[in-house]
């Protein structure tokens, strides 16, 4: 009886070890880029803060509580634009205090259960002289990748926001793989987002040459029609007249669907997930038009299986009023869908 009990015990022990190993293997099953893209879901950009020359100089300082507010509202993710190039020394080392500020912001976003995307944003010199500053972008990413190498897989990297001007499609297709290469040396499996050229315009997806990398997501931005979304914007030259409406007419909706289908067809052909990294209409447009446009863009992105992030949280395009501590409705609902 003792010998039989011992045999049974050993069998149960082996069975338990097999089950434990199986559970561990299940926990470490690699998600596909499409599954990670689904985790982005519905997000919002923390715009006008860390991508300003100095945080706060454009009116927005990221408070820790913002991430709790965003999560409780139902958003899945945040995209954090960052102007690293304003905080580097002559040898391109990132300022320690600025790096720690970014770390703090990322930590707070992740602590609140938000998928977090960090990028390089407003690297103006790169736009004008990509041959000279492309290697600087690589150096910046080497430091970022090292700093965040042990972070969870819900932190994503986005190499650069809206390549354009002298950073032509041809130049971009040569520079971004070099940044990706240094990221992969330190973060071999982390999701990396790559913007399409020409200000991340939907029509430029065809100009992006994809790398042999299964852990990437491709991103485009959507501000069409531009004379509606950017009417009255002070930074646009010449300044666009105010008063342009978007009424949700059949032809207006169809235009958005056609643009998104163009992106979707390319994505299916190349088997890559799509992230609509920015979309929004400036506050100089009337609220009714903004709500209709935002809701239509969001719904169309959902129909095509794109993840998305509204531009932006609490500034000129914002869906949250910092002064009153309330959501701007019905615009926030239009951006999120609930």
Residue ranges and their predicted role:
Residues 138-250, 257-281, 303-306:
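Active-site region of glycoside hydrolase catalytic domains
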Residues 24-79, 92-93, 266, 334:
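N-terminal carbohydrate-binding accessory modules
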Residues 286-338:
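Aromatic-rich peripheral "rim/lid" segments of glycoside hydrolase catalytic domains that contact
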